[in-house]
Amino acid sequence: MSAQIIDGKIISQTVRQEVAARVKARTDAGLRAPGLAVVLVGQDPASQIYVGSKRKACEEVGFISKSFDLPSSASEQQLLDLIDELNQDPTMDGILVQLPLPAGMDCTRILERIDPEKDVDGFHPYNVGRLSQRIPKLRSCTPKGIITLLERYNIEVRGKHAVIVGASNIVGRPMTLELLLAGATTTTCHRFTQDLEGHIRQADILVVAVGKPNFIPGGWIKEGATVIDVGINRLENGKLCGDVEFDVACQRAKYITPVPGGVGPMTVASLIENTLLACEQYHSA
């Protein structure tokens, strides 16, 4: 068996085109374009690249994008004051604060300061709570993007055993909620999990998000499984790889996401979808 590649680049581009068409329909009808405020604190090179890709995506689909770059010396209160201003700005439907934040800033306090109706990253406890109550609105971008991939490839989730490796607030925990909502029986593995191999060998759908290169041996993959690799790691030779041993896993899985070009592009596509949703649901005028 050689796994079918789940192409996140193609699906993300399709999603962007769909959003762009809806934005054009809005503006043709005399409504304003959705607005996204992107806040970057400091000079972290990786964060600058991520922010650049998000700003470019906004331009592609016809959004109004505003950039707010604060120096690494900015105080937590300065960032909170900026968020307060953006919460009151009627032209901004979404507020994105790029993570990680500089040391010393209270990430939880800052993310909770964002109006839940403008929380297009889907990190606010209100939005995570809505997902857990089966009434999602603004959903965490990476898990939402993964669900989109499964849907677009017509991969059955209902009744399947889904195993999530990693329990972060950004991916693992909301991913468990998304798969539960989709009808899967879920197992979430973390650093205290015993017999990780045993859990993985039972997975019809495996989602791995731990940030360790080739952490999951390909030989552990169940025959015919769907493998979603969220990790993106740079090796000493400069090449990128995921958290799953890709070449071996390909011989056992039915579907698999590559790294790069799998989950990553879907995170930005989901952010764009969330911003349009926030505009249509909460701030449309």
UniProtKB/Swiss-Prot annotation:
Gene3D superfamilies: Leucine Dehydrogenase, chain A, domain 1, NAD(P)-binding Rossmann-like Domain. Keywords: Amino-acid biosynthesis, Histidine biosynthesis, Hydrolase, Methionine biosynthesis, Multifunctional enzyme, NADP, One-carbon metabolism, Oxidoreductase, Purine biosynthesis. This is Bifunctional protein FolD. One of its GO terms (biological process) is methionine biosynthetic process. The NAD(+)-dependent dehydrogenase is activated by inorganic phosphate. It catalyses: (6R)-5,10-methylene-5,6,7,8-tetrahydrofolate + NADP(+) = (6R)-5,10-methenyltetrahydrofolate + NADPH; (6R)-5,10-methenyltetrahydrofolate + H2O = (6R)-10-formyltetrahydrofolate + H(+). InterPro entries: Aminoacid_DH-like_N_sf, NAD(P)-bd_dom_sf, THF_DH/CycHdrlase, THF_DH/CycHdrlase_cat_dom, THF_DH/CycHdrlase_CS, THF_DH/CycHdrlase_NAD-bd_dom. The lineage of its organism: Bacteria, Pseudomonadati, Pseudomonadota, Gammaproteobacteria, Vibrionales. Homodimer. Pathway: One-carbon metabolism; tetrahydrofolate interconversion. Its EC number is 1.5.1.5, 3.5.4.9. NADP(+) binds at residues 166-168, 232. CDD domains: NAD_bind_m-THF_DH_Cyclohyd. Belongs to the tetrahydrofolate dehydrogenase/cyclohydrolase family. GO terms for molecular function: methenyltetrahydrofolate cyclohydrolase activity; methylenetetrahydrofolate dehydrogenase (NADP+) activity. HAMAP family: THF_DHG_CYH (MF_01576). Catalyzes the oxidation of 5,10-methylenetetrahydrofolate to 5,10-methenyltetrahydrofolate and then the hydrolysis of 5,10-methenyltetrahydrofolate to 10-formyltetrahydrofolate.
